[in-house]
Amino acid sequence: MSSRRQKTSVACINCSKSHVTCQAERPCSRCVKKGLEATCVDAPRKRRKYLADVPDEQLPVAVKRGNIHEEQQLSNENRYIAHKPRFMSNAADLEYSILSDIIQQDTLLSKIPMDLLYSRDGAKDEESQYNTPNSASSVPSLGAQGRPPSARRTGSPVDSQRVKYATLLGPRGRQALKTEVDLFTTHFPLLPQEVNNSRFRRRIHFDANVRQYYLNDKTTFPEILDQIEPKPKSISLALDISSPDARAVQNFPDVPHSLRYATPMEIYTLISKPFSHTSGFHSLLQYLRSRFNREDIVEMCRSLAEFRPTFIAIAVTLTEEDMIFMEQCYQRTLLEYDQFISQMGTPTCVWRRNGQVSYVNDEFSLLTGWTRADLLFKMTFIVELMDDESVREYFKTFNRVAYRDFKGSERMKTCKLLTPFRGREVECCCIWTLKRDVFGLPLMIIGNFMPIIGQS
C-alpha cells in the first residue's frame, strides 16, 4: 500500500494556488514533479484579528507577515489607482473627488500630523509654508503650487499630480494645468490697487455729477466741494433712478457660473449639461494656499472634511439628469431673484456652494467699488472680497449653515469687504440666506450686506 501524503498547516504557494494538499517538506513532492522547486515556499497568510496588535517579531513563524517588499510595492501601487466613481452622476462624482483631493492630497496634508488635523489643541507650526500678503508678487506660479515643499526641495516630478488633477477637472483639465497658464491673472483679478496720490487720500471722495458721498467719514457736504476736480477712480453711490419696468435682465450668456438666460423657456431648453463645481473647488484651494498660512489652511480643510459625509449621503443616488435639473433650478431661481433683488435696494451678492460669485446687484457694486465685469466675467470667489478674519469665519459659518442647521439663515455680525484700493475696507453686517435644491444640497447662498456707517 502506497504511503499517503501527509497534510501540513501551511501549504506552499504553488499548491495553495491550485488548492491541493501540500507537504511540510520544501520543496514538496508535487513541486519536484512539476519542476517548481525554486518557487516552492510557504504561502503568506493573513494576520489573525486577535493578533492585530502583536508585533511581528513576537508572532510564530507560521503567522508572520509575508514578503514585506511585496506588500510595500502593492501599497505604493494602490496610492496611484485612479478615483473609482461611486456616484450615479459624473458631475457629483467629480465634485466629491475634488473635495476628497483637497482634504487628502499629497500637496497639502500628507505631511501634516493627524493629531494636528483633527485636534483643535494641536501645536502651532511656526514655519509658514504659504504666502500671506495679498499681492501679485507674492503669488507663486501654478507649477510651484502643484507640489508640496518637500517635493520642490528634492526635485520630484509632478506628472502624477497633474494627471490626478487633469482627471478630476474633466476633459479640459490638462489645458487648465499647463505651466504657462497664469491662474491668478485669469481667475483672480481682484488684487487691490495701491493709491499713491496723497491728495486723493486726504480729500472726501465723491462724484460731483450725482452729488453724493462715499460710505466713509464725512466732514462737509458735496456742494461745498463742487470746485474740487473729481478723481477718475471715484465711484458713485447714487442708485439707478430708471423705472423698474424698463429694467432688462442683465444676463451673461458667455459666463457659465452667472445668470445666463433671460427667460424660463431658454433655461429649460438650452441647459443640457450639469454645472461643474470641480474647477471652482480646485481654483479656490489654489487661491487659499497663496493667501493663508499652513495653520489656517488646515482649519479650513477641517471644515470641508466635516461636511463631506453629508454630501456623499445626499449625492450618491443622483443621476446626470438630476444634476442637469439642479442647474436648471439654479438658473431659474437666479432669474426670479434678479427681479426681486433689483427692487429691494440692499447690497446683495449670490454665490454657489463652491464660493463662486454668480450675481451682484448695483448696490453691492456701489458699496464695494467692484464692477460687475470685475466680479462676473472671471472666476471670482466670495472669499476674495473679504479680509482674512472674515474668510476664516466664512468656512465655519458655511459648514454650519449648509450642512448642519436647516433653519436657512445665519448672521455674521462683522464682515469686512475689500475694495479696489489697498488698505480700504467696508465693515458690514451680513445676513446669509441658504437656498437648497429639491435633493437637499446647498444650491445658492444669498448674502445681504449692510454697511456699518460709524465704523466704515
Curated annotation (Swiss-Prot):
Gene Ontology terms for molecular function: DNA-binding transcription factor activity, RNA polymerase II-specific; RNA polymerase II transcription regulatory region sequence-specific DNA binding; zinc ion binding
Subcellular location as annotated: Nucleus
TM regions (residue ranges): none
Gene3D superfamilies from the UniProt entry: Zn(2)-C6 fungal-type DNA-binding domain
One GO BP: cellular response to starvation
Region span, Disordered: 123-160
Cellular component per GO, a single term: nucleus
Residues within the DNA-binding region(s): 12-40
Stretches assigned to the PAS domain: 333-405
SMART domains (UniProt xref): GAL4
Family the entry assigns: Belongs to the ERT1/acuK family.
Listed name of the protein: Transcription activator of gluconeogenesis ERT1
Gene: ERT1
